[in-house]
Amino acid sequence: MPNVLHSGDLGDIIYALPVVKAMGDPGIFYITTRPWTKAMTPDRFDTIAPLLRAQSYIKGAEWWRGEHPVVDMSTFRSRSGRGLNLVAWQAQAVGVTPWVCQEKWLEVEPDEGMNGRILLHRSARYHNDLFPWTETLHSVGKSGLF
């Protein structure tokens, strides 16, 4: 991947990861703050940086100080994303296939206490009324965690 810059919210940054992985060789993931999102503070940076650094396809995560060249992924919201999820929207903005999320893209150390559990995340901000929550809950049963 080339060096990338992102100024989105934490969720935007997380859902940029499959796109970043699809860009190729490891580069630096730079983070900055912009007026159109919740301010990226040092505390918020410290929250997300360990996850970014844990990815084999990212060489490092740093606060942006004007380094070049970078692919600015912050501009994805300036394009129409109607009907797209955050991965596809960001992929479209940088010319990457939106299907990149079909491959494993998040790497974390296993937690033995979670063995056999299925972690589900429902954003407080984005809801899809067409998602089959009832069927999903029945499918995962007591293995599911929110």
Model-derived regions, located:
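Catalytic machinery of carbohydrate-active enzymes
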Residues: M1-F146
